[in-house]
Amino acid sequence: DVSFSLSGGGTASYEK
């Protein structure tokens, strides 16, 4: 599965 997280600060985290 792929998960995409966007924090309020504007940083994006992409985990495979």
Curated annotation (Swiss-Prot):
<dbReference type="GO" id="GO:0030598">
    <property type="term" value="F:rRNA N-glycosylase activity"/>
</dbReference>
<dbReference type="GO" id="GO:0006952">
    <property type="term" value="P:defense response"/>
</dbReference>
<dbReference type="GO" id="GO:0090729">
    <property type="term" value="F:toxin activity"/>
</dbReference>
<keyword id="KW-0325">Glycoprotein</keyword>
<comment type="similarity">
    <text>Belongs to the ribosome-inactivating protein family. Type 1 RIP subfamily.</text>
</comment>
<protein>
    <recommendedName>
        <fullName>Ribosome-inactivating protein trichokirin</fullName>
        <ecNumber>3.2.2.22</ecNumber>
    </recommendedName>
</protein>
<keyword id="KW-0652">Protein synthesis inhibitor</keyword>
<keyword id="KW-0800">Toxin</keyword>
<keyword id="KW-0378">Hydrolase</keyword>
<keyword id="KW-0611">Plant defense</keyword>
<dbReference type="GO" id="GO:0017148">
    <property type="term" value="P:negative regulation of translation"/>
</dbReference>
